[in-house]
Amino acid sequence: MKTISELSGIHNDEVLTVIGRGKSLGRLRLEHLDGVVMTINHAIKVVESLQPDNPLYSLQKDHLFFYPQKATLLLHEREALAEIDGVDYEPVYSFDVERDFKIRWNLPSVVIAEKLGVLFGCKRVVYLCCDAVTDGNTDTFGIPPTNPRDYLFHGELVRKHASIPVEWKRIT
């Protein structure tokens, strides 16, 4: 397993599109995917089914762990990696939020995604399928929400910690 620092600057001046777990994930289409794509938890299943040509990352920060089919797997050492007994997948990169990004380990995946975008060298982050932020809808696609009321604060948490411009877009 490699460490996340090996991906430093790999996507310099590109846009990172982060795909959340909101109900609108069911309406996601290939044309919504711009630049480098990073999915959160099980959103990888929907995105990989679209067969994008974009560079694709699967962020697995917590216990809602899903193996991708082809995407580069990004595993949080304290949560996701601790939940599984070894990793039988390549390519995989591990990270520790406190060590690598100097922020609290228990911040939500949307915050960590922006920090990964900064590490990659991206110029901005666009969030899709984060319906709690765009519409106030805390329903999720495919599996039940973990902390639905917390989702409503994700936008503010990202804004508070962001180092590059971020944008939240609706899927129509």
What are these regions (language model features)?
Residues M1-T172:
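Metal-ion/cofactor- or nucleotide/acyl-coenzyme-handling active-site neighborhoods
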